[in-house]
Amino acid sequence: MVQQFKVPETESELRQLQDKLYSITKEQTETGAFRGFRGLLEIMASETVIMTAIHNIKANKGAETAGTDGRTMRADILQQDYTQIVAKVQRSFQNYRPLSVRRKWIPKPGKSEKRPLGIPAIMDRIIQECVRIVLEPIMEAQFFKHSYGFRTWRDAHMALERVKDQVSRVGYYWIVEGDISKFFDNVNHTILIKKLWHMGVRDQRVLMIIKAMLKAGIMGEISENPLGTPQGGIISPLLANVYLHSMDEWITREWENKKTRTTYSSSRNQYQSLHRYSNLKPAYLVRYADDWILLTNSRENANRWKSRIANYLKVNLKLELSMEKTLVTNIKRKPIHFLGFTYKVTREGTAMRGYKPVVKPQADRLNRKMEEVLKDISLLQRSMDKAESVDKINRINAKIRGLINYYSVANHVNLEMARYGLRVQQVALHALRRKGGTLVSANNVSNLLSLHENYKTMLAAIPIGEGQYIGVTSPAFCKYQKTYCKKPEETPYTVKGRAIHWERTRKKMTLPRMEEILTSSTLGMLIAYGKTKPIYNLEYFLNRMYALNRDKMRCRICGKPIVDGDDYHAHHIRKNLPLSEINRVSNLASTHRSCHKLVHGQKSKDGFSPKAVRQAEKYRKKLLS
């Protein structure tokens, strides 16, 4: 029987629903009884999902990038009336017609050609995110456990670690480095819609909405897109994994997940038996989006797999495997290139199976990235004043630390990055000379203190006060970081999966909004209080709940718990901020209604503790600052 669910009224209910979608899909898929889900559109178009989608999008750095209609998240969504925006999104779901996307061309790393990035209109981004929120747990429950690209709590480091781990376990050294020609441009819409249906999306209305998303035209080029999924669309990464899921299943069904009549005590015993008594060709797949590698035991089998996969892609997915770029490599002799790293094995007697892994940053890619950083550093000389210089230095440091974090899993990463240290120092010193730039020991600068305090390397820095300096960090400040294999059970959609994530990262998921969802009765109450001014916009109603989370449901004035939604007021700490800043979570303080009146001098101090009175006076002063 096809499943249907109650529409969530709070973000807590939404998360419970996501868990349920995941668990039902997982259990029924494993037993072969999966029938899919209907009634998904009502969930996607619910007030709760819409608000969660808006919150997710506004947290991304590209939220303010306009689409073809010129509208942005802050001006045209967050600063508008709450009920009007929710109603507008819901109307869009009923008769969905996406606007054409704005195409932007960005350089391909190491190539003269550029790749297209499609930027949807902001309303289309919200619709896409609503769809993604509901579909992701259904798809995640079915995806291949060693697919790592565009998936929550998975990354490139885990994909690389899986390759290293599997090589050491099975002792195979032949690798097929897969290259699918122009994958995102050649996704067949009909095939993709059929795959969504077979993976449980049995709501025809949702399938039609996704089809409309895929066919959205490109401004100034075509009115309807016949092929491909636009790179830059929020839902595109999920759809890409859906499209390649059947390839994952087909390859793993041939070896890794081969069903046998005999039940074995371990997978190792099963594989040994398959070796002895079958003609199957060993294959271990690791995929990161459209980048994939396949590990096998001989050149002959590697070439057979290459040919078979090329045929499968052509016949079943209408895709082309680039035979020239899809390489067959023996990693004992030559490194492979995967996700910006090179990887091979070298002989060492004490290592497992006599070979140790050697991982390095891919030299040409790292060099390009560092050249971009050096260009940014040289542009520091154009800064108008010190404040602008400090802002740019912080951005440059973030880029350098980002590169270090990405390549920290490589052997001897400190030596690889140290090669750029002197050049960064010299270029930065030259660029900052007019701003009083000088060389300062790293442990004496005032930025990135927890990092710089461990080094005495001289950094190019500018003075910002008495004995205080802001410096351009060094790429040499890095250490090797051990990565561990991904536990497939780690997922945001189960209690066990979230516990594993906490154990690995010590990071908890963001708490759900503490709603009282803003129903018509709640909005009526707020209107009765006169909260219809421009500052009481969608952003206010959204962030007041996240402020309550941050304050752990306690009043910032009296310190007592806020247990009744009707008694909760979100106080604007500084009232004279512009509309773009006044409703940020940092400017909202959770209070009881009576405590809020005390802050504004509308209530007598009688009955309040001395501490509460002092807090109220403190916040009253901030109102005028």
Give names to the regions the model predicted:
Residues 539-568, 592-594:
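Short cysteine-rich loop/turn motifs with clustered Cys
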Residues 179, 559-590, 603-604:
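Histidine-centered nuclease catalytic patch
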Residues 2, 117-132, 140-143, 147, ...:
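Duplex nucleic acid-engaging cores and interfaces of nucleic-acid transaction enzymes
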